[in-house]
């Protein structure tokens, strides 16, 4: 990724996706840019909660565990960048739509959160079907 810095952008799939070196001092969409201490503390606290949920509350649900591992992995990756460099390197730029440049860790967090929401929804649906019409 550092090799992209002097180049600026390098097409990966023409007109679809390119690699573009961008330094992001904020979180998603550069929100809270320049608030490094807050972002480090808030991210660390959120990751501790996710780790707690993974190790003590996931009830042997493999899909939920996979979701939480994705969130942890992506969150830790971005946290390491932020602690060591004061910013996160983003490098994936989708050319077919107007969207922020992001990185692989962001993908892991987003997919993990979406999967976690799906697991919670499916668990609720399963609980409702177990109760039956009289208990609802």
Task: Give residue ranges: language-model regions.
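Alpha-helical transmembrane bundles and membrane-interface segments of multipass inner-membrane proteins
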Residues: 1-136
């Amino acid at each position: 990724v550092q090799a992209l810095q002097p180049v600026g952008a390098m097409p990966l799939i023409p007109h679809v996706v390119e690699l573009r070196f961008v330094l992001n001092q904020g979180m998603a969409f550069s929100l809270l840019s320049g608030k490094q201490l807050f972002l480090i503390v808030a991210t660390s606290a959120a990751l501790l909660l996710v780790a707690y949920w993974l190790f003590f509350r996931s009830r042997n649900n493999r899909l939920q565990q996979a979701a939480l591992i994705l969130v942890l992995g992506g969150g830790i990756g971005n946290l390491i960048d932020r602690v060591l460099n004061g910013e996160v390197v983003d490098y994936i730029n989708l050319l077919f739509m107007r969207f922020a440049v992001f990185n692989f860790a962001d993908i892991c967090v987003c997919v993990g959160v979406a999967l976690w929401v799906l697991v919670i929804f499916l668990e609720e649906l399963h609980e409702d079907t177990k109760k039956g019409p009289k208990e609802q």
